[in-house]
Curated annotation (Swiss-Prot):
Family designation: Belongs to the FPG family.
GO biological process, one term: base-excision repair
CDD domains tied to this protein: EcFpg-like_N (cd08966)
The protein's name: Formamidopyrimidine-DNA glycosylase
Amino acid sequence: MPELPEVETVRRGLEQKLKNFIIKRVEICRESTVAYPIDKIDFIEGLQNSLLYKWNRRGKYLIAELKKTVSNNNDANEISFVENGVLVVHLRMTGYFTFNNTLTNPCKHTRIRLFDNNNNELRYIDVRSFGQMWWVRDGLSPNNIIKGLGTLGPEPFSESFNVNYLKKVISNKTRSIKSILLDQTIIAGIGNIYADESLYSAGISPFREARTINKNEIKRLRRAVVDVLKKSIGAGGTTFSDFRDLEGENGNFGLQTNVYRRTGKKCRQCKNLIERQKISGRSTHWCRKCQK
């Protein structure tokens, strides 16, 4: 599943590529991709004539601010804009966007197509079809409509994600520290890859009970989370299967991982072999010698 760095990479690509992109036509190729509104006609009509004004990210969600075009009754050439809510996207396991400036037939796994006046197309592709989209009209709160969005913990790059916050939320937790990092209600955006890499960088065993992590270790962990995520964003994220950026390019952070998917290979630091074991059903990669 695309995690924070991959979603941030997509957000930056969309923001750069789709300047002045006004949706003139919406084509739904798979109805289940549209999670809200229930009536798909409302989704189509809600997006039509909307400018994709600004792209934001919250955890693993992409959020596009929309502005509706409104013609002046006295002058057809004069167009103004009014707020039109947001388009929210969750890529889930295999979702990604492509931008096409020539008309082409949709590929097999195309789910949603958005066209502008010049027939430029923003195409959403999703092999496993778990990804979802929501159009939330102006005046309604996406947090109240989209399950999971309103319960997200702080962003790793925010001031709220600090040592005191981490100390407070893990102080009485008997769960493993790895499970804590994966809990989106505690920290938004971290998945399996970056939980493993952050714990390795901090020198903390993923199997430790969260409440046993001392203050110095919390400081190291917070710093590791931020550093690892920034490094991955700089590399365009990680591609191990389906993730692509808007230009169809793979992320390059996978070449730089220290433990993730390096089972049986030598630790880059101590030369011990990297091990793999499951925690709460999730594959966990770690170095027994470097992580205590």
